[in-house]
Amino acid sequence: MAASATTMLLKYPTTVCGIPNSSANNSTDPSNNIVQIPQTTTTNSPLLKFRTPNKPVNAVAAPAFPSVTTTTTTTPSSIQSLVKDFDPLVPAEDALTPPSSWYTEPAFYAHELDRIFYKGWQVAGYSDQVKEANQYFTGTLGNVEYLVCRDGEGKVHAFHNVCTHRASILACGSGKKSCFVCPYHGWVYGMNGSLTKASKATPEQSLNPDELGLVPLKVAVWGPFILISLDRSSREVGDVGSEWLGSCAEDVKAHAFDPNLQFINRSEFPIESNWKIFSDNYLDSSYHVPYAHKYYATELDFDTYQTDMVGNVTIQRVAGTSNNGFNRLGTQAFYAFAYPNFAVERYGPWMTTMHIVPLGPRKCKLVVDYYIEKSKLDDKDYIEKGIAINDNVQKEDVVLCESVQKGLETPAYRSGRYVMPIEKGIHHFHCWLHQVLK
């Protein structure tokens, strides 16, 4: 179990992905060393020069979703058999929880990536990360490496972060640059994904830049959130909030769309457990809190706890207390969990988001981003104490989740039972999973 330091940050941290690359350092821009591409070409040029990058790119169409390779021999029919091992029609009071294989089987995890994470909207990052032209950040979703950037015209783009020449990861971390230069063979892409230079290629090869641009992803900005979708069935972007959160969109918007909030810190927690274990833990209406989180329990008025489920969202509300002498939660805490793996929390002067990143059938990562009202920015002691309290809660949850994973791996356990009504949020989540996985 490990967690990042909680030193206060005033910008989103740089995270390195893929191969080592000096471009992860925001102070160094290798694109500054690229000669500007002229509008005309000569037949003896060692470079194949393409049109200017501000023109639209017609990149190669991406597959409906990337393939996922596993080492299991489980067949599609056996996967569906595992899905059917949970029956959503049985009343929660009598129902068995999903079998342990949902949390341990590599092929089931691959099926989840296919049916859940490669369909619909997934949070990729935050609009403040690309607030300025030429800013970018990278990330991973399953076996998909993605890149989000803002071009010189102010438009936000998302692409598969893979060079179309030899499949090298193109960019790492986050930062600001005028173009993307592949670290392998020096191919250059504009901020709109167009290929602008293929080093050492000759005009006689007839390489078509319109077929070699970065493969685009569907992208949308909704308030502070940037969302991506790998679903190629439609390139149209409609009402993103409603598509993502359904009828709960307005409730979440009322809490999250606040220009008075300032990002201050990110904490990351690697977890040796299936991603759903943390989701289950989050959705138990604080059933576990009095037993596992002694300090956090003193902050909640459990008699006021309310849990509501609509569509793919569970919203939990609870009144805060000042019994411990430090009022972190204010009068009421609001916790919205958007299935499958993202939470928006508002309490007191704080907003936190919690992103559960699946990394394998038995591994995930929790990313917690902290925001605070600007009037509190000068209160360093309050900020540091608030972050420390919440980080400690997450560390305690990591221990619980890893313990559950170990138990699920044993022959002693196959399925459990729900305690109702306090675990109705978990049951609702499991029914949603069954619906999208069948």
Swiss-Prot record:
Cystine connections: none
EC number: 1.14.15.7
Lineage of source species: Eukaryota, Viridiplantae, Streptophyta, Embryophyta, Tracheophyta
Binding site for [2Fe-2S] cluster: 163, 165, 182, 185
Catalytic activity: choline + 2 reduced [2Fe-2S]-[ferredoxin] + O2 + 2 H(+) = betaine aldehyde hydrate + 2 oxidized [2Fe-2S]-[ferredoxin] + H2O
Cofactor: record remark: Binds 1 [2Fe-2S] cluster. Binds 1 Fe cation.
Keyword ATP-binding in record: no
GO biological process: glycine betaine biosynthetic process from choline
Protein name stated in the entry: Choline monooxygenase, chloroplastic
GO cellular component, one term: chloroplast stroma
Tissues where this protein is expressed: Expressed in roots and leaves.
CDD domains, sorted: RHO_alpha_C_CMO-like, Rieske_RO_Alpha_CMO
PANTHER family noted in UniProt: CHOLINE MONOOXYGENASE, CHLOROPLASTIC (PTHR43756:SF5)
Induction text: By salt stress.
Enzyme class: oxidoreductase
UniProt-annotated binding residues for Fe cation: 288, 293
Cofactor(s), names only, from the UniProt record: [2Fe-2S] cluster; Fe cation; Mg(2+)
Residue span, Rieske domain: 121-228
Location of the protein in the cell: Plastid, Chloroplast stroma
UniProt main location, coarse: plastid
Family: Belongs to the choline monooxygenase family.
Keyword tRNA processing set for record: no
GO molecular function terms attached to this record: 2 iron, 2 sulfur cluster binding; choline monooxygenase activity; iron ion binding
Pathway where this protein functions: Amine and polyamine biosynthesis; betaine biosynthesis via choline pathway; betaine aldehyde from choline (monooxygenase route): step 1/1
Entry keywords, A to Z: 2Fe-2S, Chloroplast, Iron, Iron-sulfur, Magnesium, Metal-binding, Monooxygenase, Oxidoreductase, Plastid, Stress response, Transit peptide
